[in-house]
């Protein structure tokens, strides 16, 4: 994302400032203070929870801002992401098309908008096919998901496929499945989300939803510059294309 933002900012000869923040920093200084001290005219925000104090401050900030992976609510806020709900629906539909009927989802952190959107897509697809849902919180953690999947499959041996809301959780799940002396994909199929660089190199290589993070960063800066130039624009939510990358971690039943 950052390289995409920097690339577009450099192209338009725009100065940019990177702020890495946490709860302790936010207690010391408000977002409005930071923007005032650094003469900020526009913001691109990423990695915040939906209840983050900085996000809540946007309603009164009156500075154009673009939120990555969060739905815009404030008057001066705009949003950009892949359509996470549609992409999750597509991933689940892909597993169903391969004959799977008992499909569990390992979601991310409950406070993350992407987790909520991807859960919604999974739930809608399963409901459309009149299938039961199994949703577990994997915290976007490879290690946690590796242990979690053992509990999932022990409690629900009927499950034949997993949709994981990130590739890291999918890789952890594969390790956990293999530790149970089960085979991926012959026994359990796994599909991830992101298409991180390592996804094609793990064994088996990971079937996943690809989102172009560089393009999200580039478009974020491009849209923000357009907003700053025009004052405001009518469109509030923007989407970057995603695609399903089929590799070796899913098989037919």
Kindly give the residue locations of the regions a language model identified:
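Central regulatory/effector-binding core of bacterial HTH transcription factors
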Residues: 6-51
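Catalytic-core regions built around general acid/base machinery
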Residues: 33-34, 53-62
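Bacterial carbohydrate/catabolite-sensing allosteric modules
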Residues: 3-17, 42, 59-67, 71-253
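Short, well-ordered alpha-helical microsegments
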Residues: 28, 51-54, 170-173
């Amino acid at each position: 994302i950052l390289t995409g933002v920097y690339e577009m900012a450099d192209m338009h000869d725009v100065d940019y400032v990177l702020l890495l923040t946490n709860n302790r920093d936010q207690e010391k200084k408000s977002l409005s203070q930071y923007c005032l001290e650094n003469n900020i005219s526009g913001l691109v925000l990423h990695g915040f929870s939906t209840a983050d104090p900085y996000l809540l401050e946007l309603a009164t900030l009156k500075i154009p801002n673009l939120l990555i992976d969060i739905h815009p609510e404030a008057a001066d806020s705009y949003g950009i992401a892949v359509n996470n709900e549609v992409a999750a629906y597509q991933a689940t539909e892909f597993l169903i098309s391969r004959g799977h009927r008992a499909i569990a989802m390992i979601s991310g952190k409950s406070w993350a908008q992407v987790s909520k959107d991807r859960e919604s897509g999974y739930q809608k697809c399963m409901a459309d096919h009149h299938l039961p849902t199994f949703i577990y919180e994997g915290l976007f953690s490879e290690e946690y998901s590796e242990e979690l999947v053992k509990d999932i499959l022990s409690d629900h041996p009927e499950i034949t496929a997993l949709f994981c809301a990130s590739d890291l959780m999918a890789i952890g799940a594969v390790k956990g499945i293999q530790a149970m002396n089960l085979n991926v994909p012959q026994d359990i199929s796994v599909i991830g989300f992101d298409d991180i660089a390592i996804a094609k190199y793990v064994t088996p290589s990971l079937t996943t939803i690809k989102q172009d993070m560089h393009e999200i960063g580039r478009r974020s800066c491009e849209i923000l510059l357009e907003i700053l130039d025009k004052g405001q624009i009518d469109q509030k939510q923007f989407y970057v294309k995603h695609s399903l990358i089929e590799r070796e971690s899913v098989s037919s039943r």
